[in-house]
Amino acid sequence: MSVPWARVRAMRLLHTSDWHLGRSLHRADLRAAQSAFLDHLVDVARAEKVDAVLVAGDVYDRAVPPVDAVELCEDALLRLHDTGARIVLISGNHDSARRLGFGSGLLEKAGVHLRTRPAALARPVVLEDAHGPLAVYGVPYLEPDAVRGELPPGQDEIPRGHTGVLGHAAGCIRADAEARGIRRRVVMAHGWVSGGAASESERDISVGGVGQVPAELFAGFGYVALGHLHGQQTIAPQMRYSGSPLPYSFSEASHRKGSWLVDLDGEGTARIEQVPAPVYRRLSVLRGRLADLLGSAAYGQYEDDFVSVTLTDPSRPEGAMDALRARFPHVLVLAFEPEGVLPDQRGYRARTAGRDDLSIAAEFVRHVSNATPTAAEKQLLASAFAAVRTEEAAG
């Protein structure tokens, strides 16, 4: 006998990503802030009776994380497991897939599912409720040149680039779900989907100058839980980035951080609610003359914030950082741009903001040789960056 929808609880998922455990903000220690977020995440999972927590990559900030970051992750996974939720976690471009995936077979038996190997991306975590099965597929970050030989086989040759490998992955997932007869399907992936807005804190993943993939690759899934971009955002109603739980650059000062609470009914249709993350310490970007910043009551509201300051005095004031720190104890960045400065006189950080590695390297070649790099030189630079990414992906 069928159960009326009104009486049947939906499958509830909690989508988070980009914890970047072990990361600092301009050398400011963020361990307490990251710990506070994980406490919040556990509280949400318990209070909302979450069935599964989806962690869409970049658990750690680097391939070999510090010991305290590993301990923080272990504690968080243990406490999330104690809420009764299953956990599905994929590796991101900052993670070492092999290290993060250690012990995955044992952890699977405890309900913690690590999807870090490309070969396993079409092997779902199957959740059951009164509506029947729901398949969660975890696609780890796929570095195109490094994983082509590790992907599940398909009928066609895999094109080069991110679109090629992710398109192949999506095709393998659809084929597996059809073979299993499972209609409700959720996909987790780590990458840059077209329409998503980047910040200054994501690592460039472009290959041959192309880092984005079309959203159409993931058409037809009940929900797509994305990681990589640090701003919480919606690509399509059923396709979202949770974003990082903390701001990891001052370009994120205006971001509202959080997670997504996702309910899936019997048809796989998502009902989605934003869950705001706690604000450990605000980020503020200030600009003005030193005397105004130190003396004006208008700046009093920023005294407990992490602060980035750009001074516009006609000449560089002496002892500016010490003076600023007396009023703003958590000032982290000090830049100097006198009023009327020409664009090419900006600092290095301002000139490179939002640019990919290849264009920055090409500008360096122009600077030292006084000539635009040739096509062969650009190809050499692109190959060098690809080799580094492949080495990082191998762990």
Regions found by a protein language model. Name each.
Residues 50-68, 85-98, 191-209:
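Active-site neighborhood of divalent metal-dependent phosphoester/pyrophosphate hydrolases
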Residues 5, 9, 47, 52, ...:
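Accessory, non-catalytic peripheral segments of nucleic-acid enzymes
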Residues 16-17, 53-58, 86-93, 113-118, ...:
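Active-site neighborhood of phospho(di)ester-bond hydrolases with catalytic His/Asp-centered motifs
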Residues 2-78, 82, 383, 387:
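N-terminal active-site segment of His-dependent metallophosphoesterases
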Residues 24-26, 59-76, 91-111, 116, ...:
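Metal-dependent catalytic neighborhoods of phosphoester/phosphodiester hydrolases
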Residues 194-195, 199-268:
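Conserved beta-sheet core of the metallophosphoesterase superfamily
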Residues 102-208, 276:
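Conserved catalytic scaffold of divalent metal-dependent phosphoesterases
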Residues 18, 38, 58, 73, ...:
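Divalent metal-coordination and catalytic microenvironments
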